[in-house]
Amino acid sequence: MAKISKRMKSVKGLVDKQKVYALDEAIKLAKETSTTKFDSTVELSFNLNIDPRKADQQIRGALVLPAGTGKTQKVLVLTNTKVKEAQDAGADFVGGEELITKIQKENWFEFDVIVATPEMMAKLGAIGKVLGPKGLMPNPKTGTVTMDVAKAIDEIKKGKIEFRADKEGNIHTIIGKASFTAEQLKENFTTILNEMKRVKPQTVKGDYIINITISTTMGPGIKVEIN
């Protein structure tokens, strides 16, 4: 069993696992319990009262975090029709079938997000089994299958994130870095919470959000009040 460092033990003692914290206190604790030497990611988990087996309760979407993510996203645009627009908008890689082949044959993944124009989707099917598990398959619901590649690139570079409920009804996402100010983290948290409420399936009965947990990379989970 891996040894728990003195620092890890001390920060775990700061968090009462049974307590549900007000947002301001939860964010303060998350920053205080960041134990990594690098700038930890601040993560958010929603446990939702949904049944993802039902088509009308499969939650998926995307939004731009107002304070950004703290990470520079590399964008690959797959297109035959919007090459210049993609290049002018600041895409890191732009191409067509030759880049699909590169992914397929060379296991090339030097990018974080794929944006594709509609005519490329049939060709992308050849590597769907590779992209799917990595969460890289473009999808109209998240705005990554589009003719407006400039808008898609701009949003991603500004801090767009995607979210999707897993088979247990949980959504895992991020709200920034431990180096962010408390106000930046609060602003991003509120934006995500409002979006979660907006996409609530109409068929859900009773409480929709069961609990929310905030944590940093390798840090303890902190339960947050739902308002």
UniProtKB/Swiss-Prot annotation:
Gene3D superfamilies: 3.30.190.20, 3.40.50.790
Gene Ontology MF annotations: rRNA binding; structural constituent of ribosome; tRNA binding
Entry GO CC: large ribosomal subunit
Coiled coil: none
Keywords: Repressor, Ribonucleoprotein, Ribosomal protein, RNA-binding, rRNA-binding, Translation regulation, tRNA-binding
Entry keyword annotation includes Ribonucleoprotein: yes
GO biological process: regulation of translation; translation
SUBUNIT field: Part of the 50S ribosomal subunit.
Function (record text): Binds directly to 23S rRNA. The L1 stalk is quite mobile in the ribosome, and is involved in E site tRNA release.
Family: Belongs to the universal ribosomal protein uL1 family.
Protein name (Swiss-Prot/TrEMBL): Large ribosomal subunit protein uL1
UniProt organism field: Mesoplasma florum (strain ATCC 33453 / NBRC 100688 / NCTC 11704 / L1) (Acholeplasma florum)
